[in-house]
Curated annotation (Swiss-Prot):
GO terms for molecular function: nuclease activity. PANTHER family: POLYNUCLEOTIDYL TRANSFERASE, RIBONUCLEASE H-LIKE SUPERFAMILY PROTEIN. Its EC number is 3.1.-.-. Pfam families: RuvX (PF03652). It comes from the Bacteria. The keyword Cytoplasm applies. It comes from Staphylococcus saprophyticus subsp. saprophyticus (strain ATCC 15305 / DSM 20229 / NCIMB 8711 / NCTC 7292 / S-41). Keywords: Cytoplasm, Hydrolase, Nuclease, Ribosome biogenesis. GO terms for biological process: rRNA 5'-end processing. This is Putative pre-16S rRNA nuclease. NCBIfam families: RNAse_H_YqgF.
Length: 142
């Protein structure tokens, strides 16, 4: 059993998908999608801090998009900057960067297989990608 819950984040330029673990550390569930504006540096950090405190979160796993050759591109750099901003807001929080290659594609594929409409997919894809990121991390702990 975990002392604190773990959340997973899929950070995009317009949204941050959020997933949360159970206290056993076995499963990840979609929690929320924050609207952000990366261009204007409105990253939703304050809203995320409230969620972290409200849900007794001790660890945050942020998806790190890497290129297939293992290099870090523009989106990866943006995720690393997001980590720095969150760490500034909560210095004692454990933040782990997790290779998220293909997590959004896997989420999209599973939603397509479930015959979810395009409009509904658009609403839940980031949260679902966060579930894939967090579940991958949780599975690595077992």
């Amino acid at each position: 059993m975990l002392k604190h819950k773990i959340i997973g984040l899929d950070v995009g330029s317009k949204t941050v998908g959020i997933a949360i673990s159970d206290l056993m550390g076995w499963t990840a569930q979609g929690l929320d999608t924050l609207r952000i504006d990366e261009e204007n540096n409105e990253l939703g950090i304050e809203a995320l801090v409230k969620i972290i405190k409200r849900d007794n979160v001790g660890t945050v796993v942020i998806g790190l998009p890497k290129n297939m050759n293992n290099s870090i591109g523009f989106r990866g750099e943006a995720s690393l900057q997001y980590k720095e901003q969150l760490q500034e807001a909560l210095p004692s929080l454990e933040i782990i960067m997790w290779d998220e290659r293909l997590s959004t594609m896997a989420a999209e594929r599973s939603l397509l297989e479930a015959d979810v409409s395009r409009q509904k997919r658009k609403k839940v894809i980031d949260k679902m990608a966060a579930v894939f990121i967090l579940q991958g991390y949780l599975d690595s702990l077992q």
